[in-house]
Amino acid sequence: MKKKYLLIFLSLIMALGLGACSNNKDSKEITIKTVTDLITRLDNYQKVKEEEKRLAEEEKKQKTSKKSIQEIEKEEIEAKAKKELEERAKKKPVIKKAKLKAFGDIMAHIAQIQYAHNKGGGEYDFSDQFTYIKDFVKNADISIGNFETTSNPNLPYAGFPRFNVPESYLKNLKDIGFDIVTTANNHSMDTELEGVMTTMDAVKKAGLDYVGSFKNKSERILLKEVNGIKIAFLAYTYGCNGRENLIVPREEVDNLCYLLNEEEIKKDISMAKAQGADFVVVYPHWGIEYQSMPNEAQTSLGRKMIDWGADLVIGNHPHVVEPVELYQASDGREGLIAYALGNFISYQNYENNKDIRVEQSLALEIDLEKDLKSGKKKIADVTFHPIWVGSYYNEYGIDVKNHLTEDFLEGGKYFDLVNESQRARIKKANDMTLKIANTGVQ
């Protein structure tokens, strides 16, 4: 376009030149020759400029190409490093954890009930029992114990031999950090079939879960999820002091889980696994009272439960501590069997029973782990915590309390709250409990 205008401009110059030199032939020839030369020169100049522009663009392109190669190399290095990090991240396990605390028999003798009534001013307040241990119970994802009594408001509250407590006892358990209570034990029918049902109602009203008794078959298995880990709970009893047979034949009591039918237990464990349980915890009420070693029936059934798929078997009933063993299942898993944990709280003691073991108990702190990537699960750690159950006297009566022994021995946070005589009992409870818990099982 520019060239077109240039030619027009030059044509005008030529026209003017021709007019001015119309009488001079030589001048006309020179003018034409000069203009032609000018056009040629301008064309050459344009070509030179275009070539310079082309060369500049080529040089720029080459520089850009070199820069791109460097950038590409940098990007490749960065991409490789990113991929390596991603590969490492894929291999690195994503561990989820859950802390379970397991406790023994939660009893309520008449002295405990009377104290709670006096403390509550006409109501029932059991909170003093747990003054020293509540922080420990709360510090867990799930805390579970055996509720060895009933709660039936239609019958008098009582201790041994037919236990019955007000609903407030369960509320106090909830307040100190309990999440689950087992309701299958030899005292489950102390207030008859009605008591089995009212106890379940009271447990739910307190905000707790129960396992071992049920209103429908789906409640045989209690499934809880903590931090992405699913834990199934099962509970069974050897019987109910024969009371079921006084009311109806035991096989017709359709609201309790019994130990007699091994196929049912095996089926329950398989069902729990089918429901997605990562770990299965079984609470059997078994063994012989006041025996520090499990009998053959306990060891046989406990190990079978692990072989069937259970991971933890937490026994109760003897009211004294029995050994804890790690047992390798037939599929290579390692399961834990605690044959008996003793009395978490009760008014059984040396003075009343002439047996110091009944005032000693064991709490288990169990750390469970699951790798979300590989799906691998394991019992990561188990810690033994001995407990001593002692009594005090005040204006309300006999104040029964449980004591985590580590808190009352040298360096413990409650060291100064007991006298030397009490500390000696606490030390004995600590040592005896750890010794029996670590005793091997044949």
Regions found by a protein language model. Give the residues of each.
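C-terminal motif of bacterial Sec signal peptides marking the signal peptidase cleavage site
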Residues: 17-20
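Positively charged n-region of N-terminal signal peptides that target proteins for export
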Residues: 1-5
